UniProtKB/Swiss-Prot annotation:
Residues 7-19 have a biased composition (Polar residues). NCBIfam families: L27 (TIGR00062). It comes from Nocardia farcinica (strain IFM 10152). Belongs to the bacterial ribosomal protein bL27 family. It holds the Pfam family Ribosomal_L27. This is Large ribosomal subunit protein bL27.
Length: 88
């Protein structure tokens, strides 16, 4: 095994792919059941009403409605509420 670098070789050049974490649907947006709301590592946001949590702590909508962010007992939560009626 060579311990000197050969011609035009490098020991650098490796990096991991980005995980694309973060909020995917923001407050007030309407969503359908099954849509991903937040991708996260750990529970930065906790699931609220009509929101489920996946094995990797991803939050997703359990029902159609509007996204609402809030707090409960000092924890950030994400809820799905009935969409506001449209004014004609």
């Amino acid at each position: 095994m060579a311990h000197k670098k050969g011609a035009s070789s490098s020991r650098n050049g490796r990096d991991s792919n980005a995980q694309r974490l973060g909020v995917k649907r923001f407050g007030g947006q309407t969503v359908k059941a099954g849509e991903i709301l937040v991708r996260q590592r750990g529970t930065h946001f906790h699931p609220g009403v009509n929101v489920g949590r996946g094995g990797d702590d991803t939050l997703f909508a359990l029902a159609a409605g509007a996204v609402q962010f809030g707090t409960k007992r000092g924890r950030k939560t994400v809820n799905i509420v009935a969409p506001a009626p449209v004014q004609a």
